[in-house]
Amino acid sequence: MSHQTGIQASEDVKEIFARARNGKYRLLKISIENEQLVVGSCSPPSDSWEQDYDPFVLPLLEDKQPCYVLFRLDSQNAQGYEWIFIAWSPDHSHVRQKMLYAATRATLKKEFGGGHIKDEVFGTVKEDVSLHGYRKYLLSQSSPAPLTAAEEELRQIKISEVQTDVSVDTKHQTLQGVAFPISRDAFQALEKLSKRQLNYVQLEIDIKNETIILANTENTELKDLPKRIPKDSARYHFFLYKHSHEGDYLESIVFIYSMPGYTCSIRERMLYSSCKSPLLDIVERQLQMDVIRKIEIDNGDELTADFLYDEVHPKQHAHKQSFAKPKGPAGKRGIRRLIRGPAEAEATTD
């Protein structure tokens, strides 16, 4: 599942897309600037698509900056001209840029019109998206030959089945996000929580330094929990939920991911969403913390006593009683037989 970023195309860009679909342009280069899709370059056709391809595409690709390229073929389908969609994400580009472009790819395809896109090509080096690379891609689609590294990465993006292998003090990039290192004091606070020495730990992402840091460990009762949820920024919360259930006293650790809607920047929303799973993986595997429930909320007002109880102990659906097998019609069951015991039979004879 890819995350949506909220980035959209302006009306000017949509007009350019419309002209492009009608065949005016051979190529469009699209970038993300100020949280909007912008057309950085557009070129009319010069020759056949094969002769235009490398001279048009390759000079536009920067070594450290992702972008999208839409390249028009000469063939048409029922909707019009067919296009190649190129997602350029060089190895040396910034992690946040890679994440942003990966998460916005589906939006761009929708804005342009997915029915016009014949092929998708993903590349980290220019050889992947050159004309030769595109032809290799077509060959791989028509045969079971092994995929190139870039093709395998695109396949993994599409099926969203990337496994993570992360540690506490390293930053690890995955196709679904980034596992930022956890600061020492944050990790120690989580250790104390797992030993029941704390009952609340709040973590935040230091976006500038790309680190998960400690924000709050104030002793927190259930009634005070809503007050701990910021209204203007995202946070991770680990709460020791002390309660009774069916006569038993329980202490359950609950993870709460609070994200106050679109008051946060796109980058902040993406980072918190991407770092969540690797953080929980560290907590559960390395600290052996048993996180009973994982909850996502927009604001603290949702955290009532009833809400938290129902999340930790969801109500079971009542078991439906199966219908008894109906009896057959009385007239077709034959003569009713009366079976008597031996004593009854002798009494009747006398």
From Swiss-Prot:
Phosphothreonine: residues bearing it: 349
Keyword rRNA processing recorded: no
Protein origin, superkingdom: Eukaryota
PROSITE patterns for this protein: ADF_H
One annotated Gene Ontology cellular component of this protein: myofibril
Chain positions found as Phosphotyrosine: 309
Location relative to the cell: Cytoplasm; Cytoplasm, Cytoskeleton
N-acetylserine PTM sites in chain numbering: 2
Region (Disordered): 316-350
Post-translational modification: Phosphorylated on serine and threonine residues.
InterPro entries: ADF-H, ADF-H/Gelsolin-like_dom_sf, Twinfilin
Matching SMART domains: ADF (SM00102)
Entry's Gene Ontology BP terms: actin filament depolymerization; barbed-end actin filament capping; conditioned place preference; negative regulation of actin filament polymerization; negative regulation of dendritic spine morphogenesis; positive regulation of cardiac muscle hypertrophy; positive regulation of neuron projection development; regulation of lamellipodium assembly
Similarity remark: Belongs to the actin-binding proteins ADF family. Twinfilin subfamily.
Name under which the protein is recorded: Twinfilin-1
Species classification: Eukaryota, Metazoa, Chordata, Craniata, Vertebrata
Name of the gene encoding the protein in the UniProt record: Twf1
